[in-house]
Amino acid sequence: MSLYLKAEKIQSWRVLIMACAGFIFNTTEFVPVAMLSDIAQSFDMQTADTGLMMTVYAWTVLIMSLPAMLATGNMERKSLLIKLFIIFIVGHILSVIAWNFWILLLARMCIALAHSVFWSITASLVMRISPKHKKTQALGMLAIGTALATILGLPIGRIVGQLVGWRVTFGIIAVLALSIMFLIIRLLPNLPSKNAGSIASLPLLAKRPLLLWLYVTTAIVISAHFTAYTYIEPFMIDVGHLDPNFATAVLLVFGFSGIAASLLFNRLYRFAPTKFIVVSMSLLMFSLLLLLFSTKTIIAMFSLVFIWGIGISCIGLSLQMRVLKLAPDATDVATAIYSGIFNAGIGAGALFGNLATTYLGLNEIGYTGAALGLIGFIIFITTHLKYRHTFLLQNK
């Protein structure tokens, strides 16, 4: 094997490790969605109230993403990743032993702190450690890792939670995180901070209207998705009257849609980025609009969830890629802001879902999400038409 091929193989393994890291970070962020009922029962709470775990986690990421990124901006990236994994593991140990809901929330905030920095640096790191001619594919691999969190992480987390308790699910995530940390220590090279940006980057980014409106679009569209997705488990059981085992299968289908979205992104996005985003947003809106209707048959629900998953996964990939394109001189800071705003959308969506469930009824979460999605869609189209020449100039 030539030295070039050997080096490329090592680089591919490094990308795979980061994809695995993305897998566990995404798993732990969303696995409560699959266990809300069990956690609520454990602490003698209403399911809608335990859904606020998602809000607290997401808003911790929102608040901490930029300050934590600026504080660690000059740190060597491998050592930073190791420190993040230590915080992540400690948070999960605390989740396992949590003796009341408030301690569990504290543990989730600890994990969210690690999350806030991890996702701020990961996309740019993956592109740095990947083979030169496989940058987009590397980002797609990272996306597959996060999609697998939905395919494997959420359903398995739910099954484990049902069999032996939700605490064991968090314990298993801690063990997996420890294993990945050892692989990072072993295989990743030292990675000096590069094009991370600093506090001086903020005024420059603030002068890029297309980027700012992209952040606004992100917040609204992600809120739309999580208004319904946060409460998908009780929706399927209480509104759709599905057996809990079928509810697990629906989550599995949602995860497989993420793999399909990653493949579509790799093949199609580079040819027509804006059209790709528009179609993805349309899929999300129509899926949310038809969510209640899909409960009439199991096939309809499975089909709709698959399309819904493709839409939201493609949106996440596309918007992140566009942020990197619009801020090549301050990738980590721009991505930190994106990560914070993305999680603001998660938190807001969980809150909107809670309000919709409380005041309108659980069956209305799809319509509420669709209305938000329409607002985000209109903002994206309007700003693209206004600033499309700027985007074309920046991508020549």
Curated annotation (Swiss-Prot):
The chain crosses the membrane at residues 15-35, 51-71, 84-104, 109-129, 137-157, 168-188, 209-229, 245-265, 273-293, 297-317, 333-353, 365-385. It comes from the Bacteria. Pfam families: MFS_1 (PF07690). The keyword RNA-binding does not apply. One of its GO terms (biological process) is transmembrane transport. The keyword RNA-binding does not apply. GO terms for cellular component: plasma membrane. PROSITE patterns: MFS. One of its GO terms (molecular function) is carbohydrate transmembrane transporter activity. Keywords: Cell inner membrane, Cell membrane, Membrane, Sugar transport, Transmembrane, Transmembrane helix, Transport. Gene3D superfamilies: MFS general substrate transporter like domains (1.20.1250.20). Involved in the efflux of sugars. The physiological role may be the reduction of the intracellular concentration of toxic sugars or sugar metabolites. Belongs to the major facilitator superfamily. SotB (TC 2.A.1.2) family. PANTHER family: PURINE EFFLUX PUMP PBUE, SUGAR EFFLUX TRANSPORTER. This is Probable sugar efflux transporter. It comes from Haemophilus influenzae (strain ATCC 51907 / DSM 11121 / KW20 / Rd).
